Amino acid sequence: MISVFDIFKIGIGPSSSHTVGPMKAGKQFTDDLIARNLLKDVTRVVVDVYGSLSLTGKGHHTDIAIIMGLAGNLPDTVDIDSIPSFIQDVNTHGRLMLANGQHEVEFPVDQCMNFHADNLSLHENGMRITALAGDKVVYSQTYYSIGGGFIVDEEHFGQQDSAPVEVPYPYSSAADLQKHCQETGLSLSGLMMKNELALHSKEELEQHLANVWEVMRGGIERGISTEGVLPGKLRVPRRAAALRRMLVSQDKTTTDPMAVVDWINMFALAVNEENAAGGRVVTAPTNGACGIIPAVLAYYDKFIREVNANSLARYLLVASAIGSLYKMNASISGAEVGCQGEVGVACSMAAAGLAELLGASPAQVCIAAEIAMEHNLGLTCDPVAGQVQVPCIERNAIAAVKAVNAARMALRRTSEPRVCLDKVIETMYETGKDMNAKYRETSRGGLAMKIVACD
């Protein structure tokens, strides 16, 4: 079973597939060298990056992420503030300390970090890392970053876990989930709670959910407190802090019934601006879509009812259930299915989680998720200058508002829907696979070709 621990992972920006995944791959590679007792023999490491990882890699900091992973770091614990000076040192000296200082190798970046526009055979996000002793290859591994910070090596691509843990209510579709709920009388969050407790202790689960919300709230707080321009040649101004000042100044005087939309926008912009700056965020289910789920929960917290441990668990468990369906039956990778697999999935997850908190039945929760995705079908991934900024940041705000609307529409519906969640997931995947590759995180089409970045 894909767990809430898998869907919501703490990491760093700006991309789960292009930053978090590659960092994990680099760390896994050095762990393998140590396990095989090869580390001491290595004199040089060479990295080859392919497809979407290459085409948008510089803007997504893929090269930096792999280097930091080889150095022994993981996305959830890496010291973000130390990254620039570490990379500068590698660039200056052409040397890299592997595995937390255990062994130093040659690493002239212009020779050892190579970008290739063509795809490897199994996925659009491929990378090959090779360790050499002189001219002799001592170990080489190919990894694929398949979205949401998930990585898999070539040998295990497409394989199920060898020994999956049995859960009380196994599922592979929304229909399965609804059937279990109907037979047991459990809510969808209650059902997912029982499954999670077969994998983790109650204390572990509660701590993880609390940590996730803490990082999400921290992203909002940093985002609404930080001014200036985001890194990169686009020079995109931060907007969340200015929007917060405007909202706070008029909060007690405005009679605008739509002001709540401004707050939702602010929450989402704040998180995504932090992500674009390389800050600490949660894959939800990806970094490119990391502002939607926090924004909708922050909306609930401010305007409906204060979030507590119970409502937090219900929201995140339902959202993760919906996210797992997309992960199992479609994709959450922008390089594979476009932005419908990132922002579209996050919107669907958030709509379902909010519907659960608003008292929806399991069927209504799935309707909310379906509505949210139905109106994200065909969404392209065309990041300008290969950065997770334009159109990504603003798109999260739009999708957060759409998620709230989808949840409300599901709760107010009195007729049977003509489209079910399983069919819209299937449609999303087919649409993504039919989509021209230039609209799937390559920066070779759409807005990416219409906007000239600053020098």
Curated annotation (Swiss-Prot):
<dbReference type="Pfam" id="PF03315">
    <property type="entry name" value="SDH_beta"/>
</dbReference>
<dbReference type="InterPro" id="IPR051318">
    <property type="entry name" value="Fe-S_L-Ser"/>
</dbReference>
<keyword id="KW-0004">4Fe-4S</keyword>
<protein>
    <recommendedName>
        <fullName>L-serine dehydratase 2</fullName>
        <ecNumber>4.3.1.17</ecNumber>
    </recommendedName>
</protein>
<comment type="function">
    <text>Also deaminates threonine, particularly when it is present in high concentration.</text>
</comment>
<dbReference type="Pfam" id="PF03313">
    <property type="entry name" value="SDH_alpha"/>
</dbReference>
<dbReference type="GO" id="GO:0046872">
    <property type="term" value="F:metal ion binding"/>
</dbReference>
<dbReference type="GO" id="GO:0051539">
    <property type="term" value="F:4 iron, 4 sulfur cluster binding"/>
</dbReference>
<keyword id="KW-0411">Iron-sulfur</keyword>
<dbReference type="InterPro" id="IPR004644">
    <property type="entry name" value="Fe-S_L-Ser_mono"/>
</dbReference>
<keyword id="KW-0479">Metal-binding</keyword>
<dbReference type="InterPro" id="IPR005131">
    <property type="entry name" value="Ser_deHydtase_bsu"/>
</dbReference>
<comment type="similarity">
    <text>Belongs to the iron-sulfur dependent L-serine dehydratase family.</text>
</comment>
<dbReference type="GO" id="GO:0006094">
    <property type="term" value="P:gluconeogenesis"/>
</dbReference>
<keyword id="KW-0408">Iron</keyword>
<keyword id="KW-0456">Lyase</keyword>
<dbReference type="GO" id="GO:0003941">
    <property type="term" value="F:L-serine ammonia-lyase activity"/>
</dbReference>
<keyword id="KW-0312">Gluconeogenesis</keyword>
<dbReference type="GO" id="GO:0006565">
    <property type="term" value="P:L-serine catabolic process"/>
</dbReference>
<comment type="pathway">
    <text>Carbohydrate biosynthesis; gluconeogenesis.</text>
</comment>
<dbReference type="InterPro" id="IPR005130">
    <property type="entry name" value="Ser_deHydtase-like_asu"/>
</dbReference>
<dbReference type="InterPro" id="IPR029009">
    <property type="entry name" value="ASB_dom_sf"/>
</dbReference>
